[in-house]
Design a protein with these regions (language model features):
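Rossmann-fold NAD(P) dinucleotide-binding segment
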Residues: 36-42, 53-69, 81
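Glycine-rich phosphate/diphosphate-binding loop of Rossmann-like nucleotide-binding domains
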Residues: 1-46
């Protein structure tokens, strides 16, 4: 993610519990380095948790100074109610299992013997899916996390029929 954002011209601030890895990343991508504890207070557009789960919790959410949480880490919310906490603070939450669906899509494409082009087409649809989830959340006045769960549940019959 850091490489993609760097190549797109984003200004980056990085942190990791592995201080050496964080320093290498900061050096390689001309990013500002902060500690894993400081990252929550950093004023930024996007907070992208990409490693540890359950990092969005009662202690960290009040410290966030961002507009969007969108990262690839699994199970970012410590509890379902934390989606409400993010919403109450005006922070848009991109549900992790929608954003990081590329891995499972890749596995499915492999099992179905799909081409690289077919795989890339599926992966680019993640963006559209995310927009659908945000729209569902807005229309139904629910959190994006709940909307993502409803969306996934609505897709299960289709997925099961592919077997």
């Amino acid at each position: 993610l850091v490489a993609l954002l760097h190549d797109a011209g984003a200004r980056l601030i990085v942190a990791d519990v592995d201080k050496e890895r964080a320093a290498t990343c900061a050096r390689n991508y001309d990013a500002k380095l902060v500690s894993a504890e400081e990252i929550y207070e950093v004023a930024a557009d996007i907070f992208a948790p990409c490693a540890l789960g359950a990092i969005l919790n009662d202690q960290t959410i009040p410290r966030l100074n961002v507009e969007i949480v969108a990262g690839a880490a699994n199970n970012q919310l410590s509890a379902e109610r934390h989606a409400l906490d993010l919403e109450a603070r005006g922070i848009l939450y991109a549900p992790d299992f929608i954003l990081n669906a590329g891995g499972i899509i890749c596995g499915g494409a492999y099992l179905l013997n799909e081409t690289q082009h077919q795989l890339e087409q599926r992966i680019t649809k993640i963006y559209d899916t995310l927009l659908e989830v945000f729209d569902l959340a807005k229309r139904c006045r629910i959190t994006s996390a709940t909307a993502a769960e409803r969306y996934a549940e609505s897709r299960l019959p289709i997925a099961m029929s592919v077997r």
